[in-house]
Design a protein with these regions (language model features):
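Non-catalytic DNA-recognition/assembly elements of restriction-modification systems
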Residues: 1-15, 140, 148
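A short glycine-rich beta-alpha junction/loop motif
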Residues: 88-94, 126-152
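Short, recurring structural edge motifs at helix starts
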Residues: 17-18, 52, 128-130, 139-146, ...
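Extracellular/lumenal glycan-associated surfaces
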Residues: 2, 152-164, 168
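Ligand-binding loop in jelly-roll beta-barrel domains
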Residues: 99-104
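Sequence-specific dsDNA recognition surfaces
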Residues: 7-20, 34-62
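Short, ligand-facing micro-motifs at secondary-structure edges
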Residues: 37-50, 65-91, 106-110, 119-123
Length: 171
């Protein structure tokens, strides 16, 4: 496994200013940061919220992960979702991380949402009533990763487990 700082293997952006008030019956698909606290998805390949398109919107490429920029606690904010579909508008209050090809988005999302990386991410959160995390905080996180083939196998395994859990919860 290789160990690198996230800032060495990824670039960063911020979601655009969409909020819950912008939700419409139809329009462009929209991912809002609140979904991370209601759906708890590590892999996002579809959304059920829509908004009217507007200039300056940041759309997913299908290869990024999102990390909330704010939350109620350090533990809440220490999570990530891989956006695996192109063309989803990324709403406000999201840190958007574009990993280089040496790291798969799904593997990185699982890594940041669990274990020692999640603990380190929680430690970076700042604030009392509302905690925040910025791209500059994310850049310094140490990330360990195997080769891409193994990352894909790990991501597929955990994604299959998530799907199975979701299926059983619906019963």
């Amino acid at each position: 496994w290789e160990q690198r700082k996230l800032g060495e293997i990824a670039s960063f952006s911020k979601g655009s200013g969409y909020s819950k008030a912008d939700i419409r019956e139809s329009g462009i698909p929209l991912f809002l940061y609140g979904r991370m606290y209601t759906q708890y998805e590590t892999r996002v390949d579809s959304v059920d919220t829509f908004a009217a398109p507007r200039p300056g919107t940041l759309y997913s490429k299908g290869t990024e992960i999102v990390v909330p920029a704010s939350g109620e606690s350090a533990e809440d904010i220490a999570r990530a979702s891989a956006i695996t579909r192109e063309g989803i508008a990324l709403g406000g209050d999201l840190n958007v991380v574009y990993p280089q090809r040496m790291v798969t988005p799904l593997f990185l999302a699982y890594g940041l949402s669990h274990g020692s990386s999640q603990e380190l991410l929680a430690q970076k959160a700042q604030g009392k009533t509302v905690v925040h995390i910025h791209a500059s905080d994310l850049k310094g996180l140490g990330i360990a990763f195997p080769d891409v083939t193994e990352q894909q196998a790990i991501g597929t395994f955990f994604s299959s487990l998530d799907d199975l859990i979701t299926l059983h919860q619906r019963k």
